[in-house]
């Protein structure tokens, strides 16, 4: 879905560039205009600083005021240096040379008068379409346990769902993601802000792990006798 969106946005951008050659774009009523730079869809495109410079200059000419740079896609890998998470160095067979990706975005954007906000997907750590990410490589215990019509299973088994969400109540993951966030702002204090996505449970089917049951029973002060049916029940 994101790839389709990026292709559509790219087409609209090309059309807009052709229409605006001799015009000075104006931001409506001083409202911010945001351009989103997806991590996975643009991995090869933004593989060198010159490409970043080119697109930032283009969006500036179109009147955009903010660049939203995706630095933690749904795999849980990141696009900045940190000791707390693996760095995404390859996507779909393309290996990116090592450079300060986010740092260059910030430097060039600020030269152009554009704000930079880093975007991070929070309670997710895997891509189910490619069996890739932290819940596949190192931390399967972080994956959300979902209650489906077929029974209780790991979200990594739901191959029609691309985001392998984690259990937000998992304290080990909470420590992990907080370390990632704190290290990001420590390393890049000139960031203008953060945008946090997927700060939630996967949905009504999550989370039905033993951990969630224990935490819920401690919260209400009694045992759940029929689990998961006392929470909700699928009807055929």
PLM features: residue spans?
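Positively charged n-region of N-terminal signal peptides that target proteins for export
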Residues: 1-4
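C-terminal motif of bacterial Sec signal peptides marking the signal peptidase cleavage site
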Residues: 18-19
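Active-site-adjacent "subsite" loops/lids of carbohydrate-active enzymes
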Residues: 29-46, 118, 123-188, 231
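Hydrophobic faces of well-ordered beta-strands that scaffold small-molecule active sites
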Residues: 33-37, 67-69, 116-118, 194-196
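Catalytic domains of carbohydrate-active enzymes, especially glycoside hydrolases
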Residues: 51-77, 189
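Conserved, mostly hydrophobic/aromatic
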Residues: 59, 67, 109, 177, ...
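Aromatic-lined substrate-binding rim segments of carbohydrate-active enzymes
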Residues: 74-121
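Aromatic- and acidic-residue-enriched segments that line the glycan-binding/catalytic groove
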Residues: 79-91, 124-159, 198-235
């Amino acid at each position: 879905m994101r790839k389709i969106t990026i292709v559509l946005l790219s087409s609209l951008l090309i059309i807009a560039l052709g229409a605006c050659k001799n015009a000075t774009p104006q931001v409506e009523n001083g409202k911010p205009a945001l351009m989103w730079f997806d991590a996975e869809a643009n991995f090869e495109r933004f593989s060198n600083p010159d490409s970043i410079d080119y697109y930032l200059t283009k969006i500036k000419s179109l009147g955009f005021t903010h660049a939203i740079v995706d630095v933690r896609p749904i795999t849980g890998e990141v696009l900045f240096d940190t000791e707390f998470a693996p760095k995404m160095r390859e996507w779909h067979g393309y290996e990116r040379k090592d450079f300060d990706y986010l740092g260059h975005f910030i430097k060039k954007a600020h030269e152009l008068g554009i704000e930079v906000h880093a975007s991070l997907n929070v309670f997710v750590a895997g891509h189910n379409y490619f069996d890739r990410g932290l819940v596949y490589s190192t931390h399967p215990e972080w994956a959300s346990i979902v209650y489906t019509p077929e029974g209780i299973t790991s979200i990594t088994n739901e191959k029609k769902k691309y985001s392998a969400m984690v259990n937000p109540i998992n304290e080990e993951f909470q420590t992990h993601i907080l370390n990632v966030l704190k290290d990001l702002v420590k390393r890049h204090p000139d960031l203008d802000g953060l945008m946090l996505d997927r700060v939630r449970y996967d949905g009504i089917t999550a989370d039905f792990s033993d951990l969630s049951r224990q935490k819920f029973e401690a919260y209400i002060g009694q045992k759940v006798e029929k689990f998961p049916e006392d929470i909700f029940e699928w009807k055929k």
